[in-house]
């Protein structure tokens, strides 16, 4: 099967290191090339071993996982998977801070007789091993972040009824920035499908709520869609918009390998809101959301996707581009500004 996926396991608990290694041993194509008990060792061993993926604990002696993540992403960028025993036992801002610093994903530590947790870990490691990470500078640089974009055509402004979003790997970071920048009087409801381990769904909503002037929470079946409110799709079910002004939560089958599915949400918004739907597909692996974005475009709504330059993984937006489902490609840093312009009735220029 070619070269094995090399993994560095970082955790101050010997038992946890052993359990992680045992879980990864279930896949013959994954090789643990090193283990260590603190962040300082992790930085040194990353430079020496150049692993494909690092599993990172947060709370460790000598150097914690956050500081180690910051050093690694600045000095030797490597896909980092943050592991935690229980999201509810730790302040969510600590775990999610690792994502802000460049870690790619969150996962539950495997326990004895872990079962699904072990296989979820293996699956995540295999996925992250193919991600091309970027260097995260430890000090912000001055000057313009992006060159000016040249418009190739002009789209009419959209009367915004609802904003629906699909995101996966790298999505929490983009959502955090988007929601932290949107004003409290943003005039449309926002509904988001973010692929994440079910155990992290509630803490994700809390983390995003703490950054935003909007009211952010997990969606509940039958609740109203209101301006200034952001609903996060709960795990294990599909979130839909069955009719205007109301959200629905329903059981079903996976779509594009996911439940909740971004495509299911976006298609329901296309049916219900038509031209007043704004669809947004952000960074992520796979193709979820692409067919849903096409449905919004065909219904006369506005179809927006994150550009390759700013994606951790261009899979989902790339699939939308391949389907010719995208009206407008934007940088991940420009999502909030784009939505505000639409809300003000301004036209968007299309360019890559």
From Swiss-Prot:
Main location: cytoplasm
Reaction equations catalysed: [protein]-L-glutamate 5-O-methyl ester + H2O = L-glutamyl-[protein] + methanol + H(+); L-glutaminyl-[protein] + H2O = L-glutamyl-[protein] + NH4(+)
Ranges for domain CheB-type methylesterase: 156-346
Sequence positions bearing 4-aspartylphosphate: 57
Active site annotation, chain numbering: 168, 195, 288
Start and end residues of each Response regulatory domain: 6-124
EC number: 3.1.1.61, 3.5.1.44
SUPFAM superfamilies xref list: CheY-like, Methylesterase CheB, C-terminal domain
GO molecular function, one term: phosphorelay response regulator activity
GO CC field: cytoplasm
Pfam families on file: CheB_methylest, Response_reg
Keywords recorded for this protein, A-Z: Chemotaxis, Cytoplasm, Hydrolase, Phosphoprotein
HAMAP family hit by this protein: CheB_chemtxs
Function recorded in the entry: Involved in chemotaxis. Part of a chemotaxis signal transduction system that modulates chemotaxis in response to various stimuli. Catalyzes the demethylation of specific methylglutamate residues introduced into the chemoreceptors (methyl-accepting chemotaxis proteins or MCP) by CheR. Also mediates the irreversible deamidation of specific glutamine residues to glutamic acid.
Domain notes from UniProt: Contains a C-terminal catalytic domain, and an N-terminal region which modulates catalytic activity.
PANTHER family with a match to the protein in the record: PROTEIN-GLUTAMATE METHYLESTERASE/PROTEIN-GLUTAMINE GLUTAMINASE (PTHR42872), PROTEIN-GLUTAMATE METHYLESTERASE_PROTEIN-GLUTAMINE GLUTAMINASE (PTHR42872:SF6)
Name of the molecule in the record: Protein-glutamate methylesterase/protein-glutamine glutaminase 2
């Amino acid at each position: 099967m070619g070269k094995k996926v090399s993994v560095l396991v970082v955790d101050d608990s010997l038992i946890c290191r052993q359990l992680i290694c045992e879980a990864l041993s279930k896949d013959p194509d994954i090789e643990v090339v090193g283990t260590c008990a603190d962040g300082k060792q992790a930085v040194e061993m990353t430079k020496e071993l150049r692993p494909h993926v690092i599993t990172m604990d947060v709370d460790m002696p000598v150097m914690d996982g956050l500081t180690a993540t910051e050093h690694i992403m600045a000095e030797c960028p490597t896909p980092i998977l943050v592991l935690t025993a229980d999201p509810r036992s730790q302040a969510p801002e600590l775990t999610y801070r690792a994502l802000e610093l460049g870690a790619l994903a969150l996962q539950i530590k495997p326990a004895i007789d872990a079962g699904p947790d072990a296989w979820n870990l293996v699956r995540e490691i295999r996925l992250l091993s193919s991600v091309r990470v970027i260097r995260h500078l430890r000090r912000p640089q001055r000057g313009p972040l992006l060159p000016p974009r040249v418009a190739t055509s002009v789209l009419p402004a959209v009367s915004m009824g609802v904003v629906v979003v699909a995101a996966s790997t790298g999505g929490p970071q983009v959502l955090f920035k988007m929601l932290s920048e949107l004003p409290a009087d943003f005039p449309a409801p926002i509904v988001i499908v973010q692929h994440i381990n079910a155990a992290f769904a509630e803490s994700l909503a809390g983390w995003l709520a703490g950054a935003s002037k909007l009211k952010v929470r997990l969606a509940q079946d039958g609740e109203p869609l209101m301006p200034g409110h952001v609903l996060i799709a709960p795990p294990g079910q599909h979130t839909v918009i069955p009719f205007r002004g109301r959200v629905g939560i329903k059981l079903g089958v996976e779509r594009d390998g996911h439940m909740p599915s971004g495509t299911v949400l976006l298609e329901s918004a296309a049916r219900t809101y038509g031209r007043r739907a704004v669809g947004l597909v952000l960074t992520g692996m796979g193709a979820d959301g692409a067919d849903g974005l096409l449905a919004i475009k065909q219904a006369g709504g506005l179809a927006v996707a994150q550009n390759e330059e700013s994606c951790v993984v261009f899979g989902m937006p790339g699939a939308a581009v391949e389907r010719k489902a995208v009206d407008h490609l934007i940088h991940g840093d420009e999502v909030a500004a784009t939505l505000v312009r639409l809300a003000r009735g301004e036209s968007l220029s299309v360019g890559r």
